[in-house]
Swiss-Prot record:
Transfers the acyl group from the sn-1 position of phosphatidylcholine to all-trans retinol, producing all-trans retinyl esters. Retinyl esters are storage forms of vitamin A. LRAT plays a critical role in vision. It provides the all-trans retinyl ester substrates for the isomerohydrolase which processes the esters into 11-cis-retinol in the retinal pigment epithelium; due to a membrane-associated alcohol dehydrogenase, 11 cis-retinol is oxidized and converted into 11-cis-retinaldehyde which is the chromophore for rhodopsin and the cone photopigments. Pathway: Cofactor metabolism; retinol metabolism. The keyword Cytoplasm applies. This is Lecithin retinol acyltransferase. It comes from Mus musculus. Keywords: Acyltransferase, Cytoplasm, Endoplasmic reticulum, Endosome, Lipid metabolism, Membrane, Sensory transduction, Transferase, Transmembrane, Transmembrane helix, Vision. Inhibited by all-trans-retinyl alpha-bromoacetate and N-boc-L-biocytinyl-11-aminoundecane chloro-methyl ketone (BACMK). Induction: LRAT activity is up-regulated by dietary vitamin A. Under conditions of vitamin A depletion, LRAT expression in the liver is induced by retinoic acid.
Amino acid sequence: MKNPMLEAASLLLEKLLLISNFKLFSVSVPGGGTGKNRPYEISSFVRGDVLEVSRTHFIHYGIYLGENRVAHLMPDILLALTNDKERTQKVVSNKRLLLGVICKVASIRVDTVEDFAYGADILVNHLDGTLKKKSLLNEEVARRAEQQLGLTPYSLLWNNCEHFVTYCRYGSRISPQAEKFYDTVKIIIRDQRSSLASAVLGLASIVYTGLASYMTLPAICIPFCLWMMSG
């Protein structure tokens, strides 16, 4: 049975990301999600390479470990709902991903290149040129990725897939995607202390003017954005 609250939260996050053009914060990757079973030329990948694909409204990153294996930090709501590894190891759908972002649950897991890419085109080591940082040796990059496998808390701003790969590749956790998302949101929300006030005002507007009020969406979105931006 579907949970209406999780369904609504998933839809809200998706709309927020669309509004902020989050997908445009990194390079546009053509062909995203056009065919989950498409073949990939994995012989061109080297252990320790950073792989980059377009996934839902995010640019998703992973570290190639060799032998058709990719380590990547992946939000997944199922991690909060079950300990059944057979279920959680299945390919993470876009809805599972979005709900995992909302609930801040994730793991650093290993998938095949095909499952990681989810039908999108793959860019290799594109961050090297974007960030203009000196990368570590590829074997060290892969070793760092392997050492971090397992459950991890998720934060859109402080611990996402880009933070994971930049730590492995360059030795420091940075995420231009997250920084640009934060810059967009803070134009509207300047102080986290406004969360309680906005929630109270939003509740009052809903009570007195009804759910159809034009004030309802901001009343819900502002506290929700603050929740997602918290560590």
